[in-house]
From Swiss-Prot:
Pfam families: WASH_WAHD. It comes from Xenopus laevis. Its main location: membrane. This is WASH complex subunit 1. Residues 294-411, 429-472 are annotated as: Disordered.
Length: 472
């Protein structure tokens, strides 16, 4: 008995009963085929029932979850209290989904294993050629009368084989040519040479397509603007709703619904309204009370950082006849607290010779004004008045004028001396001791400078004395 081929995608196979068999042989083949058909059908229906039961169990689980959620919703419908619902950001599903599997996965064909051998005792009938010819009249015989197979064989390798598992096995290596449809001789250097039917070689080659309208009519295509697909948050126009603060006895609305600031940051572009924390108030009552009690007890607490010593008072200026300095008052003696265990004579000597800041350290809050007051104020600073300084300058100028006019008493000499002094004052030069008794500037440059008229003098207090000299 010849072996029957089965399609590779099928899980089961059934043998066919061959014609022209002996009676006993035909009965055995029919019996074996029907038994195998019964086994295959039972296996198929059992797999279908198993898949139906699996889907039914899954549907029951989904219905159970649905009924539970529906019961929770029904319980929350009559409640008038605010309820927080936390939604998971991740979909409630397993990390790896279960792949679909066919119901015939793992099915095995047991026909080859269950094939039995039977011993036939009857003999074959002699061959009758006339009977064979008569059977050809009644049984259809497929005869290919067209020559399409020959033409297709010339174009390609023929029909596709059954053992092709991938596209790479179908196409030529590193190309897109299907050799079963069109045979191609590939040369990497010379290009692709195609072997075709000799009858088709006389046909005209395909013409190129017409050029587009943008080239033939010289039209320019409009450049399309690129669309922006980025997410741009926008609140838009928020409607203003005027409703009362509380709406009691409404169906499906909670009565104790309150909004607080701990809902988290808002979404863009709204600005996060974070309240500024209030700083604690600072009071100095406790500090002042503690400092007063410490002073009453005679104890001074040292400051945390050592304060820098105040600057020493400026040295007194030289005494003048106009403002004699007043004697400084004696420093106030502060009695030091007596120690319980006695004091060392070496320590007393060091304390007596040390400055006041070292003996009694300050609390680090001494200011410049306090140091000025301790120095004696205006009375001990030996300060001079501005008016007294002006009077002294005026007297010095008068003495210089008297010394300059001592050489001659005529009008021309006085005028010459005045002009020389005025030019020196404008130029900023101070006359030396020997120049005060001289006759005046000499030389060509000095004579030229004498011809230049002097600048008008500024309005000063000494101008009245000059006018008096002119009038005299």
């Amino acid at each position: 008995m010849p072996q029957n081929r089965s399609v590779e995608s099928q899980a089961y196979s059934l043998p066919l009963i061959l014609p022209d068999l002996r009676r006993e042989e035909a009965i055995h083949q029919i019996t074996d085929t029907l038994q195998h058909l019964q086994t295959v059908s039972n296996d198929i229906f059992s797999r279908i029932l198993q898949r139906v039961e699996t889907n039914r169990d899954q549907l029951q689980r989904i219905n159970g979850r649905l009924s539970l959620a529906q019961a929770k919703i029904e319980r929350l419908k009559g409640s008038k209290k605010a309820i927080k619902v936390f939604s998971s950001a991740k979909y409630p599903a397993p990390d790896r989904l279960q792949e679909y599997s066919s119901i015939f996965a793992g099915a095995k064909d047991g026909w080859s294993a269950k094939k039995q051998r039977h011993k036939i005792q009857s003999k074959h009938r002699p061959l009758d050629e006339q009977a064979v010819q008569e059977k050809l009249k009644y049984f259809p015989v497929c005869v290919n009368t067209r020559g399409q197979d020959e033409e297709s064989a010339e174009e390609g390798l023929g029909s596709l084989p059954r053992n092709i598992n991938s596209v790479s096995s179908l196409l030529l290596f590193n190309t897109t040519e299907n050799l079963y449809k069109k045979y191609v001789l590939l040369d990497p250097l010379a290009g692709v040479v195609t072997r075709t039917n000799p009858a088709l070689e006389g046909e005209d080659e395909e013409k190129l397509f017409d050029a587009p309208l943008s080239i033939t009519k010289r039209e320019q295509l409009e450049r399309q603007t690129a669309e922006n697909y980025f997410y741009v948050p926008d609140l838009g126009q928020v409607p203003e709703i005027d409703v009362p603060y509380s709406l009691p006895d409404l169906l499906g609305v909670a009565d104790d619904l309150m909004y607080s600031a701990d809902l988290g940051p808002g979404i863009a572009p709204s600005a996060p309204g974070v309240p500024i924390p209030e700083l604690p108030t600072f009071t100095t009552e406790d500090i002042t009370e503690n400092s007063i009690t410490d002073r009453q007890d005679g104890r001074l607490l040292p400051p945390p950082p050592p304060p820098p010593p105040p600057p020493p008072p400026p040295p007194p200026p030289e005494p003048s006849a106009l403002s004699p300095p007043a004697p400084p008052p004696p420093p106030l003696s502060i009695p030091a607290p007596a120690k319980k265990g006695g004091s060392d004579p070496g320590d007393q000597g060091a304390v007596q010779g040390a400055p006041k800041e070292v003996v009694n350290p300050s609390n680090g809050r001494a200011s410049l004004l306090e140091s000025i007051r301790q120095a004696g104020g205006i009375g001990k600073a030996n300060l001079r008045n501005v008016k007294e300084k002006k009077l002294e300058k005026k007297k010095m100028k008068e003495q210089e004028q008297v010394g300059a006019t001592g050489g001659g008493g005529d009008l021309m000499s006085d005028l010459f001396n005045k002009l020389a002094m005025r030019r020196k004052g404008i130029s900023g030069k101070v006359p030396a001791a020997g120049e005060a008794s001289g006759d005046g500037p000499t030389g060509a440059f000095a004579r030229i400078s004498d011809t230049i008229p002097p600048l008008p003098p500024p309005h000063q207090a000494s101008g009245d004395g000059d006018e008096d000299d002119w009038e005299s």
